[in-house]
Amino acid sequence: PVDIDRYDFIRLGVKERWAVLLPAEDPLVQKGFVTAADLVGKELLFPARLKVQNELVSWFGDYFPQVRVPYTCNMSTNASIMVRNGLGYAFHIEGSRPFLDRSQVCSLPLYPELAATTVLAWKKRQPFSVTTTKFIEFAKNFVKTYNNREQ
């Protein structure tokens, strides 16, 4: 979820899945995905943004009162280090995982899937240079063409 109230934006149409970073030796790795029930009793690292936290709480449903969220973290690099050092399981967008040793930290998608869409955003009523204006026009046309091709 993105707070776009103060911004003009283009929705890029790319779906990004949420996933969990966990220690590579965790038995859940063999399962290939993570459910809310799998995370009961685990210490979790949530993203710091409240809108994202609300999405995750909703995904957990009735299981949420049974989990602990002692930490928040905005950077997947920091989250990976915290997971590697045994501080918990971290939520992140699949593919945002930094270049750490995969033999220490793994990423598994959530099931049921929780997805977000990406936006390209810029401040409303902002004067832009010619270059920036041309870039925004290009991006709008590109996304429109791309989305029409995907349908």
What residue spans do the PLM features occupy?
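Short coil/turn segments
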Residues: 1-2, 17-18, 23-33, 43-53, ...
